[in-house]
Amino acid sequence: MLGLRPSLLLALAGLFFLGSAVSQECTKYKVSSCRDCIQSGPGCSWCQKLNFTGPGEPDSLRCDTRAQLLLKGCPADDIMDPRSIANPEFDQRGQRKQLSPQKVTLYLRPGQAAAFNVTFRRAKGYPIDLYYLMDLSYSMLDDLNNVKKLGGDLLQALNEITESGRIGFGSFVDKTVLPFVNTHPEKLRNPCPNKEKACQPPFAFRHVLKLTDNSNQFQTEVGKQLISGNLDAPEGGLDAIMQVAACPEEIGWRNVTRLLVFATDDGFHFAGDGKLGAILTPNDGRCHLEDNMYKRSNEFDYPSVGQLAHKLSESNIQPIFAVTKKMVKTYEKLTEIIPKSAVGELSDDSSNVVQLIKNAYYKLSSRVFLDHSTLPDTLKVTYDSFCSNGASSIGKSRGDCDGVQINNPVTFQVKVMASECIQEQSFVIRALGFTDTVTVQVRPQCECQCRDQSREQSLCGGKGVMECGICRCESGYIGKNCECQTQGRSSQELERNCRKDNSSIVCSGLGDCICGQCVCHTSDVPNKEIFGQYCECDNVNCERYNSQVCGGSDRGSCNCGKCSCKPGYEGSACQCQRSTTGCLNARLVECSGRGHCQCNRCICDEGYQPPMCEDCPSCGSHCRDNHTSCAECLKFDKGPFEKNCSVQCAGMTLQTIPLKKKPCKERDSEGCWITYTLQQKDGRNIYNIHVEDSLECVKGPNVAAIVGGTVVGVVLIGVLLLVIWKALTHLTDLREYRRFEKEKLKSQWNNDNPLFKSATTTVMNPKFAES
């Protein structure tokens, strides 16, 4: 049952792949030929039937999905729909190959993937090259002694796996600059802590033995090796691995399975660590062996892990990290980045290295990674893996199957898709760690293989050839059937007459420019008509009412973006019935004379409010200056408007009967209070006004009394301030005089000269004073 499962999954994946290709849509843009059509998308097809498009219809209607073209009446034989194709080529010479087919030719249509199957069958006894790369720092002394004894055992273990095995040897320590090694001359000669111990000077990498099938030679060359030493714990192992991968001729790699055993008891330096030793140049990934020594290690930084992973994959080398127990987790993290690599726990003295290599090889050879060489961005490759153990994965960036047994095939479905028309190119698919490859030749599928109809004389008016259903006109002729003669005018000059307002779009993108005039397309939308000098108009792009253009055919019609309403209707979408009954006030005046009626509703002038435009809340009080002046001239024949009252106050009618409105009380031109009442009538600035008969005039103030009182007050305040100042100065002088009198009474005078000094000096004998 499990044996059938991969094939069943493969069939289902193929059906899904075909189904997804059929269900695609066609999104076209500026399509004028079959080539343009098939590049528009994988779902687009082209109809080459003659006269498939009618008058005014663009050639772009020939481009659509196959289903739509069939519905439009295009015969199936006239539909051009080139598909992406994969043509595998199998080796017929009977050579033993682990990958098949050996070559595949793809014809790729943009956006449509081509799929093909790659089968891997693991062969028994495939040749192996094994290179043993050993850390010779002082802590590996016991390991070196054991490896010297295991040369024959290593080659014998290879012969148990394969009929053709070879083995080589190399060693490494670290860069020979501080802080990686002690640069004292004595320490450079003998870096070991025990001076009596024979040690060789430190080095970055030494290629000791080229790959060979002679176990005695291996044992002899390894037996000559001496231990060395360095300062810090991490070693320069990545430098050594890079040289092993970058120097295939010096190492002696064959085009077979390549294994690299990396034996160490510590970590590793990587890119950036070289700066500690003033080494700033990045590692270039090239071979720099001179006399089997990496002599330029102090010029280049350590490689990065990613750089090393790429180089190992490029060189098809599978590393086996034989490390001590404390380093297993560190190198397991490294194998997550480096494909087709394994980790084995090395005993403290490397006595188990033979079994470790055998176990790691079986683990590596039973897992297959299918990958490809570097591709441009326009190509995308995905893998569907169908493994013999029942596991599967879909749409991954590389194929992956584990537990692959000898002679038990596993199948990968490879899908290749181009995002655009590409140039012819090729790439290689290979199983990592194995030598077999699949060469994939990619060719573009961007042309239509239409029937040749150019021999028919009646087509294209004899002035062109028919290609895929459309005319390709001779020089000097243009048009759908080459009916227009340019008469020396360029197509740019003719098209200039078809561009509105010097636009870059010909005929608004909705027509063809034929002999300098726009011939509008027939729209795909039912009942839609495109018209106008530049095909800029139609009969559907107008405002809608009740979800219908211009309210429906019974209300109006659309004409180039504006509704033309039928009698009895109005509005931008013919949404209104033509009537004014809803706009009449109680006096049957439309909008009170302060607005206009639209859609049977008042549109009021600024400052007035619906429904009848009677109120003006933003106008403020009616008691304004011009109304007060009108009341003054109409009632009392005076004021600013006295001479032209009939003109300035034409909208006001003086009433003798009081009005029931809020009165206004304002000052007139003479300062008297005048009281009047206003009643607004229909229209703007039309009022009835009633003015009270009497004026309230208030007597003015006594100016002389105010001025005289002010002057007297100022004088009195000045006199008072002078009196206060005089009193203060008198009190100050009196206080000073009394203080002077008091000081004079205290002073006492004598007749001694204070500068006189006596000439007599008396000295007392202290002994005499005691007696």
UniProtKB/Swiss-Prot annotation:
The keyword Nucleotide-binding does not apply. Glycans are attached at N51, N117, N255, N502, N626, N644. It is found in: Cell membrane; Membrane raft. One of its GO terms (biological process) is cellular extravasation. The modification Pyrrolidone carboxylic acid is found at Q24. Residues 25-75 form the PSI domain. Residues 24-702 are extracellular. Ca(2+) 1 binds at S139, D142, D143, D265, D348. Both Ser-747 and Ser-758 become phosphorylated when T-cells are exposed to phorbol esters. Phosphorylation on Thr-760 (but not on Ser-758) allows interaction with 14-3-3 proteins. The modification Phosphothreonine is found at T760, T762. Residues 1-23 form the signal peptide. Ca(2+) 2 binds at D174, N230, D232, P234, E235. Gene3D superfamilies: 6.20.50.10, Cytochrome c1, transmembrane anchor, C-terminal, Laminin, ligand-binding face of the semaphorins, domain 2, ntegrin, alpha v. Chain A, domain 3, von Willebrand factor, type A domain. The keyword tRNA-binding does not apply. Disulfide bonds join C26-C44, C34-C448, C37-C63, C47-C74, C192-C199, C247-C287, C387-C401, C421-C446, C450-C468, C460-C471, C473-C482, C484-C515, C498-C513, C507-C518, C520-C535, C537-C560, C542-C558, C550-C563, C565-C574, C576-C599, C583-C597, C591-C602, C604-C613, C616-C619, C623-C664, C630-C649, C633-C645, C672-C697. GO terms for molecular function: amyloid-beta binding; complement component C3b binding; metal ion binding. Residues 726-771 are cytoplasmic. SMART domains: INB (SM00187), Integrin_b_cyt (SM01241), Integrin_B_tail (SM01242), PSI (SM00423). The chain crosses the membrane at residues 703-725. One of its GO terms (cellular component) is external side of plasma membrane. Heterodimer of an alpha and a beta subunit. The ITGB2 beta subunit associates with the ITGAL, ITGAM, ITGAX or ITGAD alpha subunits. Found in a complex with CD177 and ITGAM/CD11b. Interacts with FGR. Interacts with COPS5 and RANBP9. Interacts with FLNA (via filamin repeats 4, 9, 12, 17, 19, 21, and 23). Interacts with THBD. The VWFA domain (or beta I domain) contains three cation-binding sites: the ligand-associated metal ion-binding site (LIMBS or SyMBS), the metal ion-dependent adhesion site (MIDAS), and the adjacent MIDAS site (ADMIDAS). This domain is also part of the ligand-binding site. Belongs to the integrin beta chain family. Integrin ITGAL/ITGB2 is a receptor for ICAM1, ICAM2, ICAM3 and ICAM4. Integrin ITGAL/ITGB2 is also a receptor for the secreted form of ubiquitin-like protein ISG15; the interaction is mediated by ITGAL. Integrins ITGAM/ITGB2 and ITGAX/ITGB2 are receptors for the iC3b fragment of the third complement component and for fibrinogen. Integrin ITGAX/ITGB2 recognizes the sequence G-P-R in fibrinogen alpha-chain. Integrin ITGAM/ITGB2 recognizes P1 and P2 peptides of fibrinogen gamma chain. Integrin ITGAM/ITGB2 is also a receptor for factor X. Integrin ITGAD/ITGB2 is a receptor for ICAM3 and VCAM1. This is Integrin beta-2.
